[in-house]
């Protein structure tokens, strides 16, 4: 975690960089992207995929997953020490889809992890290129965020399913480093901490001995990451209390749930990055585009530009709507699962609808699904405008919000009111201000009550024409605030299952 005074931008976290200037950052992010692209090209050659098959998002996901699994040291070690029936710890693979005689066929492939690591390193000038691996993890995480609701996980940790807007990055592995920590929502950090505390309550030895010491360090580090996301002194002080606790237990769980609730109004700073599938980077590199020389940013115009000029295909099940599948992937590409739908619609230039109204299931195809009836179609991932991604939660104010999701987490730095349903949120805060954190709780509640409806967030920030790469002329959109803005509104999205 960067200490005070050495705040690094996401791009620096993304590329493990020390302090760099803007040009160096753009170059190192570009280098990371071209490494992913070169790796993807090589894998398509190895697998003898046609151009169309190489641009199929399902094939991209399998290839990305293979390299992530090949580099998952802890799991590899675990698999070697606990051999399970029918699983070769040295191999990795998945489904590859090919077009044969006018039909889609599924082929299960298996590769040596060592071989995949060799191809990856070769594509990345001999480096392990951890930044590129993390980038792919964040893309998978963003896809999960747009596809699934985490209701069950929220309920299991004692949180409210309506707090889903705080759950960005909830499926990111712990090993995703600083870049991963930056994109995790407040709810995600709270959930990780609660799980840890609950294990400590049930297992007497959890905090003891050499292992316990390591656990404690991890606990405090996670608290520090959470603290860094809060923007008010009272919230930060309360995280300090949780971190300093001698023997974390139910009181800390209560405090953490309180903090998570407060983040619905007093929003945390959560980074947003546009991470695209490898099948976008591959063809761009193959066409001769030099990412490292041109430079690249995950939070500017570059991903929008890249998507304007990319062809990506997806398998479509018999009763799915290709336009809806496109929306799902568009949201994932821009990490916009918890953004206000009005803002997303304006930028995309087509209406973005709530999850429950989408006629599409996830992008991945289960191994038992019938391939006979599978079609494929082009994903429409282009946009009308572009906007800078945000790393702050914006300031807070009150608007009508929905029954399913009662707050949003902004993705795009665009002037607007940030909707939340104050009465619903505040109802959860009645009477519970006793105990050692009482003064902080009182202060946080006061701050929440005084959050004003008229406050406009991201003052003067707008969207930009795709021809305006220097972001010179912002267009500040006006939004109809009487409409519904939440994606998971009164929703029936599938649950995420590990």
Swiss-Prot record:
Motif Bipartite nuclear localization signal, residue numbers: 198-216
Classification via InterPro entries: Flu_NP
Compartment annotation: Virion; Host nucleus
Region (Disordered): 1-22
UniProtKB keywords: Capsid protein, Helical capsid protein, Host nucleus, Host-virus interaction, Ribonucleoprotein, RNA-binding, Viral nucleoprotein, Viral penetration into host nucleus, Virion, Virus entry into host cell
Ranges annotated as biased composition (Basic and acidic residues): 8-21
Domain of life: Viruses
PTM notes: Late in virus-infected cells, may be cleaved from a 56-kDa protein to a 53-kDa protein by a cellular caspase. This cleavage might be a marker for the onset of apoptosis in infected cells or have a specific function in virus host interaction.
Biological process terms in GO annotation: symbiont entry into host cell; viral penetration into host nucleus
One GO molecular-function entry: RNA binding
Predominant subcellular localization, coarse grouping: virion
Residue window of motif Unconventional nuclear localization signal: 1-18
GO cellular component: helical viral capsid; host cell; host cell nucleus; ribonucleoprotein complex; viral nucleocapsid
Main function: Encapsidates the negative strand viral RNA, protecting it from nucleases. The encapsidated genomic RNA is termed the ribonucleoprotein (RNP) and serves as template for transcription and replication. The RNP needs to be localized in the host nucleus to start an infectious cycle, but is too large to diffuse through the nuclear pore complex. NP comprises at least 2 nuclear localization signals that are responsible for the active RNP import into the nucleus through cellular importin alpha/beta pathway.
Family in the record: Belongs to the influenza viruses nucleoprotein family.
Subunit: Homomultimerizes to form the nucleocapsid. May bind host exportin-1/XPO1. Binds to viral genomic RNA. Protein-RNA contacts are mediated by a combination of electrostatic interactions between positively charged residues and the phosphate backbone and planar interactions between aromatic side chains and bases.
Protein's name according to its UniProt entry: Nucleoprotein
Annotated organism of origin: Influenza A virus (strain A/Swine/Cambridge/1/1935 H1N1)
């Amino acid at each position: 975690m960067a200490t005070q005074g050495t705040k690094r931008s996401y791009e620096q976290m993304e590329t493990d960089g020390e302090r760099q200037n803007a040009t160096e950052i753009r170059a190192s992010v570009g280098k990371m992207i071209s490494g992913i692209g070169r790796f993807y090209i090589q894998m398509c050659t190895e697998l003898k995929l046609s151009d169309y098959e190489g641009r199929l998002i399902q094939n991209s996901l399998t290839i990305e997953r293979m390299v992530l699994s090949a580099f998952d040291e802890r799991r590899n070690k675990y698999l070697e020490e606990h051999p399970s029936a029918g699983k070769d710890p040295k191999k990795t693979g998945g489904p590859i889809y090919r077009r044969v005689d006018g039909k889609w066929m599924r082929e299960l492939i298996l590769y040596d992890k060592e071989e995949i690591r060799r191809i990856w390193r070769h594509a990345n000038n001999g480096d392990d290129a951890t930044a590129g691996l993390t980038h792919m993890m964040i893309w998978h995480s963003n896809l999960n965020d747009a596809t699934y609701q985490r209701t069950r996980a929220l309920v299991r940790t004692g949180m409210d399913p309506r707090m889903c807007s705080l759950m960005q990055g909830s499926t990111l592995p712990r090993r995703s480093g600083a870049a991963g920590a930056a994109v995790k929502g407040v709810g995600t950090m709270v959930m990780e901490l609660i799980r840890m505390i609950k294990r400590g309550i049930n297992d007497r030895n959890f905090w003891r001995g050499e292992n316990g010491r390591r656990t404690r360090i991890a606990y405090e580090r996670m608290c520090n990451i959470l603290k860094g996301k809060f923007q008010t002194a009272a919230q930060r002080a309360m995280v300090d209390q949780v971190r300093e606790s001698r023997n974390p237990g139910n009181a800390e769980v209560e405090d953490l749930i309180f903090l998570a609730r407060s983040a619905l109004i007093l929003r945390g700073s959560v980074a947003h990055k546009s991470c695209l599938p490898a099948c976008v980077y591959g063809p761009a590199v193959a066409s001769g585009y030099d990412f490292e020389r041109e430079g690249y940013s995950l939070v500017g115009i570059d991903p929008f530009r890249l998507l304007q000029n990319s062809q990506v295909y997806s398998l479509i099940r018999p009763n799915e709507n290709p336009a809806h599948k496109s929306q799902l992937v568009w949201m994932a590409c821009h990490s916009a699962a918890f953004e206000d739908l009005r803002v997303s619609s304006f930028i995309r230039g087509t209406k973005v609808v709530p999850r429950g109204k989408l006629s599409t299931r996830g992008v991945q195809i289960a191994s038992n699904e019938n391939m006979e009836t599978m079609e494929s179609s082009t994903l429409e991932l282009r946009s009308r405008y572009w906007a800078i991604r945000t790393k702050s939660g914006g300031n807070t104010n009150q608007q009508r919000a929905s029954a399913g999701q009662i707050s949003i987490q902004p993705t795009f730095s665009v002037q607007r009111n940030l909707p939340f349903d104050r009465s619903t949120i505040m109802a959860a805060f009645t009477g519970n201000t006793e105990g050692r954190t009482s003064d902080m709780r009182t202060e946080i509640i006061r701050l929440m009550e005084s959050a004003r409806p008229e406050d406009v967030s991201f003052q003067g920030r707008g969207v930009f024409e795709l021809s305006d790469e220097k972001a010179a002329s912002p267009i500040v959109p006006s939004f109809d605030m009487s409409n519904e803005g939440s994606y998971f509104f009164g929703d029936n999205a599938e649950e995420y299952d590990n």
